[in-house]
Amino acid sequence: MASFQRKLAQGLESRGIEVVYRLEDTPFAAVLVVGGLRDLAGLSRARQRGIPVIQRLNGMNWLHRLRRTGARHYLRAEYGNAILRLIRSRIATKIVYQSDFARDWWEREHGPTRVPAWVIYNGVDLELYNPNGLHSRPEHAWRVLLVEGRLAGGYEVGLETAVGLVQRMQAFRSRPVELVVAGEVAPSLQMYWQNQAHISIRFMGQVAPEQIPEVDRSAHLLYSADIHAACPNSVVEALACGLPVAAFDTGALSELVTQDAGKIVPYGGDPWRLDPPDLESLASASLEILVEQDRFRPAARARAEATLGLDRMVEAYLEVLLPGRV
């Protein structure tokens, strides 16, 4: 969320549009609500003054209902859902969904809105995130990359699946396959998998945004672990760097990863119930990507250039925020 705000603000400011971050910083021409907001009264007053209120929506919190994440996390997740639902139904004058999947999910659960809605994919700076530049991609091993901000609160299941994927890939091939995890992982969880996985696994911890392009270029494949992700930035960034993506067909992955930009395979069960996934099919698809890098890497970059550029995203948001200004 912070990454999106920073990129959008920079894009707007480069077009001569001032950006403020508090409802008290009047005057302003429109309000973009990114995530939850505590000052619902202030938001309502802005709408009453005739100021457009645009809500940007991804998905909803749901993993906490299936996995034990603690009472505090459960209540926080439900509270977050309630705030988003209230803004969507009572306050917003326009809605921007991050993907068709996100729109369909919200409309299935809570019905369509009476206000206009758009779908705008997340974008990335195609000059900063590109296939050319420093990298340390190994020549005699295959590197599978997992990028998540934080693997906790139920999202630990993504690491478990990534380990299972690499185990099966290693069983199919004699060439070494290593798993690199970029993101916050509890030390106890790191130790558990280092002792139990029986594969080469390296935990990088949280990686600074400016280092992500080199990290992406240094891998052969990104495994997108987030189930039912609305529009994961890690996928957008990987594609821009020419890194093919492998994932199960959940969330918006099939919208983002098209043609030879990667491989999206059926989950093999009910992902909404966290059924065990079909790792054999994903491993087979992943190995196809690994042995045909010359086919998949250019296609990944081409997909990003066609649809996922930052300028394209900024212009789309600008048309919603300030119609006619573009």
Residue ranges and their predicted role:
Residues I227:
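Aromatic "clamp/platform" in nucleotide-sugar-dependent glycosyltransferases that forms part
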Residues G149-R150, V163, R175-Q190, G205:
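Glycosyltransferase donor-sugar binding loop
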Residues R85-P116, V124:
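A short, active-site helix/loop in glycosyltransferases that binds the activated sugar's phosphate group
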Residues Q190-P213:
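Nucleotide-activated donor-binding/catalytic signature segment of Leloir-type glycosyltransferases, i.e.
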Residues H135-Q167, V180:
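Conserved donor-binding/catalytic core segment of Leloir-type glycosyltransferases
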Residues E107-R108, G123-H140, E214:
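Acidic anion/phosphate-binding donor-loop and adjacent secondary structure
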Residues L134, P277, S281, L290-L321:
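A charged, aromatic-enriched C-terminal amphipathic alpha-helix characteristic of glycosyltransferases
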